[in-house]
């Protein structure tokens, strides 16, 4: 078994919907919901929701790159979001719900940029990809009740995943491509 561990940080709108797809993959050691990219130290959910902290809801993933490489994380990430929407994701609007790939080193940046370019050229989306690739910033874990929300509140999570429009978007854009 490999001893390697790396971090990947992705903002993809509501973090509730970003945990499950990664959590279920081999080589994923930990998926944590939280906040990143802003100026407020140790923000609360309520503060982030005001769109005044500069933070985005995000997930930070600890993974073994020998089992689940960063390139595969990127592929899975793109399939969870609308990368053409710079105003938020699905039913959630505002700065805190914008997408972003937070890179932890130069190799991640190179892979993220190549992945974004490939997606832009794929023709899957009619509009340009606006997801930003940013340097990793301090990551602040969200409150405990947000962690692994899909396990703690299955019915509400499923209702939200569908009701927000995310599930339908994923189905219409990726069902025959993954």
From Swiss-Prot:
InterPro entries the record matches: Met_Sox_Rdtase_MsrA_dom, Met_Sox_Rdtase_MsrA_sf
Gene3D superfamilies per the UniProt record, alphabetical: Peptide methionine sulphoxide reductase MsrA (3.30.1060.10)
Protein name as catalogued: Peptide methionine sulfoxide reductase MsrA
Presence of the UniProt keyword Oxidoreductase in the record: yes
Family stated for the protein in its record: Belongs to the MsrA Met sulfoxide reductase family.
UniProt keyword Oxidoreductase present: yes
Molecular-function GO term, any one: peptide-methionine (S)-S-oxide reductase activity
UniProt keyword terms in alphabetical order: Oxidoreductase
Sequence intervals crossing the membrane: none
Domain of life of the source: Bacteria
Biological process per Gene Ontology, one example term: protein modification process
Enzyme Commission number, as recorded: 1.8.4.11
Active site per UniProt: 14
Function as written in the Swiss-Prot or TrEMBL entry: Has an important function as a repair enzyme for proteins that have been inactivated by oxidation. Catalyzes the reversible oxidation-reduction of methionine sulfoxide in proteins to methionine.
UniProt cross-references to Pfam families, sorted A to Z: PMSR (PF01625)
Catalytic activity: L-methionyl-[protein] + [thioredoxin]-disulfide + H2O = L-methionyl-(S)-S-oxide-[protein] + [thioredoxin]-dithiol; [thioredoxin]-disulfide + L-methionine + H2O = L-methionine (S)-S-oxide + [thioredoxin]-dithiol
Species in which this protein is naturally found: Bacillus pumilus (strain SAFR-032)
PANTHER family linked to this entry: PEPTIDE METHIONINE SULFOXIDE REDUCTASE, PEPTIDE METHIONINE SULFOXIDE REDUCTASE MSRA 2
């Amino acid at each position: 078994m490999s001893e390697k561990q790396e971090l990947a940080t992705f903002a993809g709108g509501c973090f509730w919907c970003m945990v499950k797809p990664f959590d279920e993959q081999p080589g994923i050691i930990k998926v944590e919901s939280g906040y990143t990219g802003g100026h407020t130290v140790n923000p609360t959910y309520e503060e982030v929701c005001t769109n005044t902290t500069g933070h985005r809801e995000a997930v930070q993933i600890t993974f073994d790159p020998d089992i689940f490489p960063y390139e595969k994380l990127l592929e899975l990430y793109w399939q969870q979001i609308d990368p053409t929407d710079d105003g938020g994701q699905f039913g959630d609007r505002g700065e805190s719900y914008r997408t972003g790939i937070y890179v932890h080193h130069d190799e991640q940046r190179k892979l993220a940029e190549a992945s974004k370019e490939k997606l832009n050229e794929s023709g899957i989306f009619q509009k340009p990809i606006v997801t930003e690739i940013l340097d990793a910033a301090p990551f602040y874990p969200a409150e405990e009740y947000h962690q692994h929300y899909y396990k703690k509140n299955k019915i509400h999570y499923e209702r939200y995943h569908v009701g927000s429009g995310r599930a339908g978007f994923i189905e219409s854009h990726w069902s025959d491509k993954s």
